[in-house]
Amino acid sequence: MKKLILFLFLSTSLFCFGQGKSALKDIQSIKFYGVDYSQAKVFGADESPIQFKDAFRRINELFITEAKKYNVGKQLKKEVTEISLDAVNQVNENINLAELMTTKREYSLSKEQIKAAIEALPIQKTPGVGMVFIAQFLDKSNNRGTYEVVFFNTETKEIIEEWITDGKARGFGLRNYWAGSVYSCLLYTSDAADDLI
């Protein structure tokens, strides 16, 4: 039943994304800001919140240290003019560790929460288009990570387009395991770009 709900949610999100495809089609370049974990919840994991917080920082570093694998520009077929992790590192550093873990088997962000997360990113308000992954639910019991892909105006922080996606977590060690879900979502983003942009 839960898989059916997720499928319907993904289908609805992709339909909405398709409605805004002309806006994304006209975008030639983007600034990439990494993965924002400030709104995320973790379910079913044995590791501590502080271990997750450290893993979040190291996952984002992969966009620099393993840029060939985690190549956002290649997947989107757009020029990435800048990869800046400062903003997500700052908000991730301020995660409330007492609220990171959850006992609830389902969790998702509202449109208002996503908008607030974009507003909270401490970036310079210059003309351009930014992209960020906003982590929603890291579900160890199902080996899945759910993320919101968000394109936004970096000057006004107005959201241009967004959609939800999830990816299979895999790999050895806490960082690599959840980085696997990010990589899966990055590949899915490439498929979505081919279909909808």
State where each predicted segment sits.
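Surface-exposed short loop/turn segments
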Residues: 93-153
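Residues in well-ordered beta-strands of folded domains
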Residues: 7, 33, 132
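Bacterial Sec-dependent N-terminal signal peptides
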Residues: 1-23
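Short secondary-structure boundary motifs at beta->alpha junctions and helix caps
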Residues: 155-187
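Solvent-exposed loop/turn segments at secondary-structure junctions
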Residues: 37-40, 136-141, 168-169
